């Protein structure tokens, strides 16, 4: 952990080490060649400037790939401020390169929870020409933390007592303390923010779930675009990205041979599918746990055993949570696991594993092995290794998904930002998805890079199917 992040005199950035900028720039240059979707969008929209002067806050992993996204948003006119959406996911050389280029960025690997939420606040804080503090007009969110902070702050200014209610977690306590401080230091701030805020595009399953929950209660403050459920995001980033990055995280963290190990993957959605296939590709024997009969049947038809966590205790060598739910691996599970077990998470939040309960377990001994690898000696004498403190193992212990697959996701994010701004007076306060035509276009932008040549329908074939020669080729209800 870097406990003394570097800042600029004008609060332009707060990062680990500005001297890493040259290294970061070299890797950004490499990534650009692997991100044809984003680079094509730059070329298409650079002269049109569809986001000219628009204040955009990003709360998304500050990686090399995200740096390419940030510079794409800037190239099409946006005024950008950025923070990471995870305390461990920042690549410090990427943050340094972005800071050097003039973008305000507040992120470093190994933030405390207090630092993390303060960075989110700084990314949300813009200063107008007259010195007035205001917020973004658009948000690029990943997990929904920036969206959550604005909603909770606005509700506090409108009579909510949530900040005085008992907290379910340490992180919730941190959020409440921050909101109380802002209420004193910046009275009426969140109302000003909401008055200017026009929309949010959400990157991940967990954040989308939050949006639908808020929308169902009628409390959603702005239109939102669900980027996660674009086919070129969920079926690529979530599936193929995890298929490569999970094993990378495990290998870098533990230097362990996966072949022959018994691994349990909790959840068989798109992330779970990618994770299960990642482990099996290395020769691990994989068991899947599921609550959904459809996903369970899919796993079984792929040749995976489907059991419960309880059935695997004392047998499995590795546990990976992928669900987006809470309390998937509980303290009673961890104390019953075999000696030398590895436990990690590749879902968005750390509450999939009862990390707080493990840290406070009577008689437990915690030993830090290296950054993001902790050894717990349990009261029964067994050892458990927890990776990335229960947060995203692929970003905490490795570098996340490869650039090519992230080009799909970030092309969707950029198109969503353009769509939100162009239709800010049209969209209602609800959750939307990008049209299938744009989904197909994102895929099309990536084909040449990998040597794909599409077959073209004849006019007669298109008429027979009842579609256009140019697409869309599938109905909205089609399951890819």
Curated annotation (Swiss-Prot):
Subcellular locations according to the entry: Cytoplasm
Similarity comment text for this entry: Belongs to the adenosylhomocysteinase family.
Gene3D superfamilies associated with the record: Adenosylhomocysteinase-like, NAD(P)-binding Rossmann-like Domain
Encoding gene (name): ahcY
Functional summary from the UniProt entry: May play a key role in the regulation of the intracellular concentration of adenosylhomocysteine.
GO molecular function: adenosylhomocysteinase activity
Biological-process GO terms, alphabetical: L-homocysteine biosynthetic process; one-carbon metabolic process; S-adenosylmethionine cycle
Species this chain originates from: Xylella fastidiosa (strain M12)
GO cellular component term, pick one: cytosol
Lineage, highest ranks first: Bacteria, Pseudomonadati, Pseudomonadota, Gammaproteobacteria, Lysobacterales
Keyword Translocase assigned: no
Keywords of this entry: Cytoplasm, Hydrolase, NAD, One-carbon metabolism
Binding-site residues, substrate: 63, 142, 203, 233, 237
Protein name per its UniProtKB record: Adenosylhomocysteinase
Domain of life: Bacteria
């Amino acid at each position: 952990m870097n406990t003394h992040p570097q800042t600029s005199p004008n609060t332009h950035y707060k990062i680990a080490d500005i001297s890493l900028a040259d290294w970061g720039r070299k890797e950004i240059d490499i990534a650009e060649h692997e991100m044809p979707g984003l680079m094509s969008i730059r070329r298409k929209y650079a002269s049109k400037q569809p986001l000219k002067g628009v204040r955009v806050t990003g709360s998304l992993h500050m990686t090399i790939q995200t740096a390419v996204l940030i510079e794409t948003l800037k190239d099409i006119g946006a005024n950008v401020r950025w923070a990471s959406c995870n305390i461990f996911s920042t690549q410090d050389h990427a943050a340094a390169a972005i800071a050097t280029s003039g973008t305000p960025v507040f992120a470093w690997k190994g933030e405390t929870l207090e630092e993390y939420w303060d960075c989110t606040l700084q990314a949300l804080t813009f200063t107008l020409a007259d010195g007035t503090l205001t917020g973004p007009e658009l948000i690029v969110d990943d997990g929904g933390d920036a969206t959550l902070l604005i909603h909770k702050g606005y509700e506090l200014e409108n009579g909510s007592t949530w900040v005085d209610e008992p907290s379910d977690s340490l992180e919730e306590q941190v959020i409440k303390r921050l909101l109380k401080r802002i209420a004193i230091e910046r009275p009426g701030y969140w109302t000003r923010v909401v008055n200017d805020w026009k929309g949010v595009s959400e990157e991940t399953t967990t954040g989308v779930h939050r949006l639908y929950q808020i929308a169902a209660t009628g409390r959603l403050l702005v239109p939102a675009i669900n980027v996660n459920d674009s086919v070129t995001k969920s079926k690529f980033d979530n599936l193929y990205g995890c298929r490569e990055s999970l094993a990378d995280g495990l290998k870098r963290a533990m230097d362990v041979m996966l072949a022959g190990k018994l691994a349990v993957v909790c959840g068989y959605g798109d992330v779970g599918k990618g994770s299960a296939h990642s482990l099996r590709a290395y020769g691990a024997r994989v068991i899947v746990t599921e609550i959904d009969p459809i996903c369970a049947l899919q796993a079984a038809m792929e040749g995976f055993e489907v059991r419960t966590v309880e059935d695997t205790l004392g047998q499995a060598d590795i546990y990976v949570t992928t669900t987006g739910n809470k309390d998937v691996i509980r303290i009673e599970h961890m104390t019953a696991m075999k000696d030398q077990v590895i436990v990690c998470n590749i879902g968005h939040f750390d509450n999939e594993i009862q990390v707080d309960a493990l840290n406070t377990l009577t008689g437990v001994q915690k030993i830090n092995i290296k950054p993001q690898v902790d050894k717990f000696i349990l009261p029964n004498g067994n050892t458990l290794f927890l990776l990335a403190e229960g947060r995203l193992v692929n970003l905490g212990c490795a570098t996340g998904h490869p650039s090519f697959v992230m080009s799909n996701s970030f092309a969707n994010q950029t198109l969503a930002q353009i769509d939100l701004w162009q239709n800010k007076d049209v969209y209602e306060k609800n959750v939307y998805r990008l049209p299938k035509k744009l989904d197909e276009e994102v895929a099309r932008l990536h084909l040449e890079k990998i040597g794909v040549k599409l077959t073209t329908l004849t006019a007669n074939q298109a008429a027979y199917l009842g579609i256009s020669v140019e697409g869309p080729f599938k109905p909205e209800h089609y399951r890819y």
